[in-house]
Amino acid sequence: MHEYSIVSALIEQCEQHALANHAAKITRVDIKLGVMSGVEPSLLQTAFDTFKLDGICKAAQLNIQIQPLVILCQDCQSESVLSERTIVCPACQSYRTRVLDGEDMLLMQLEMEQEED
């Protein structure tokens, strides 16, 4: 299950941002998860809930925004947002498409609480 290594890297990134901003804890983690990222949202949530128990993210809520697949057709220049995992242009049925969005997982926003003086 590669979700564990992904969550480990995500929590490390959160910790770096918290340290840079002198935060005592992180209360919310917002990510964008592409449908073609190869990451299963429910497994990612379970892995996050497991890994967050120790450290600065232990009180954090993980919010996952699913990003649909967005393609650009190289033949008809049509840009399409697709709900299915296909790379076929719905306008002209061409396979000559380029993925614009929906393949990645991105950390979008953190909600942090500052250290008390």
Swiss-Prot record:
Q: Which GO terms describe its biological process?
A: protein maturation; protein modification process
**What keywords sit in the KW lines?**
Metal-binding, Nickel, Zinc
Binding locations of Zn(2+): 73, 76, 89, 92
Family indicated by similarity: Belongs to the HypA/HybF family.
At the highest ranks, the source species' classification is: Bacteria, Pseudomonadati, Pseudomonadota, Gammaproteobacteria, Alteromonadales
Tagged with keyword ATP-binding: no
A GO term, aspect molecular function = zinc ion binding
The UniProt entry, under HAMAP family, shows: HypA_HybF (MF_00213)
- A Pfam family that this protein carries is HypA
What does the UniProt function comment say about this protein? Involved in the maturation of [NiFe] hydrogenases. Required for nickel insertion into the metal center of the hydrogenase.
Which positions bind Ni(2+)?
2
**What is the name of the protein in this document?**
Hydrogenase maturation factor HypA
